[in-house]
Regions:
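P-loop (Walker A) phosphate-binding loop of NTP-binding proteins
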Residues: 8
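Hydrophobic anchor at the beta1->P-loop junction of P-loop NTPases
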Residues: 5
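Glycine-rich phosphate-binding loop used to anchor ATP phosphates in small-molecule kinases
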Residues: 55-100
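Conserved phosphate-donor/acceptor-positioning beta-strand/loop module used by diverse small-molecule
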Residues: 89-111, 117-127
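Conserved lysine of the Walker
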Residues: 13
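Conserved substrate/cofactor phosphate-moiety recognition/catalytic segment
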Residues: 22-63
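Small-molecule kinase domains that catalyze NTP-dependent phosphoryl transfer to phosphate-bearing small molecules
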Residues: 116-143
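Hydrophobic positions on the alpha1 helix immediately C-terminal to the Walker A/P-loop
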Residues: 16
Length: 143
């Protein structure tokens, strides 16, 4: 069985995916971690990578292809990604969301590489990231 966990930034996708994969003894994949690795390799923040993705579709393609390949070649795993349910249609799908203030607090607490001066800065960055993602999703995937 393949379980896809989608949701908003800071909603707990990775935490739930890790706990579920441990409970089921499944492999865990995180496309958010994969994107953070790409950002780090390019010397960018995750927000800056999102801005770059607006004009460079090769980054999204790399992430999309990774998910598609996992869905076609592996079984018994949990993956957290905003679009994993789309790219792995034969999966059990979970969507998570939380209040923006809760999400911002989680982001400021959990992700050292994305450190923000305060919760409001995390809220602003989350809103900007979601807006950037939504614009790309409409352009690239028509949803």
């Amino acid at each position: 069985m393949i379980i896809t966990i989608s949701g908003t930034a800071g909603s707990g996708k990775s935490s739930v995916a890790k706990a579920l994969s441990k409970k089921l003894d499944y492999k865990h994949y995180s496309m958010g971690d994969f994107q953070r690795e790409i950002a780090k390799a390019k010397g960018l923040s995750i927000v800056q990578l999102g801005e770059l993705e607006k004009t460079d579709p090769s980054i999204d393609k790399m992430v999309d292809d990774k998910q598609i390949n996992l869905g076609k070649t592996q079984d018994n795993f949990v993956i957290d990604s905003r679009l994993s349910a789309h790219f792995i249609p034969n999966s059990f799908k979970i969507f998570l969301d939380a209040d923006i203030n809760v999400r911002a607090k989680r982001i400021t607490k959990v992700r050292e590489a994305e450190s923000y001066a305060d919760v409001q800065k995390a809220i602003d960055a989350s809103i900007k990231r979601e807006k950037t993602n939504q614009e790309r999703f409409i352009e690239y995937y028509e949803f």
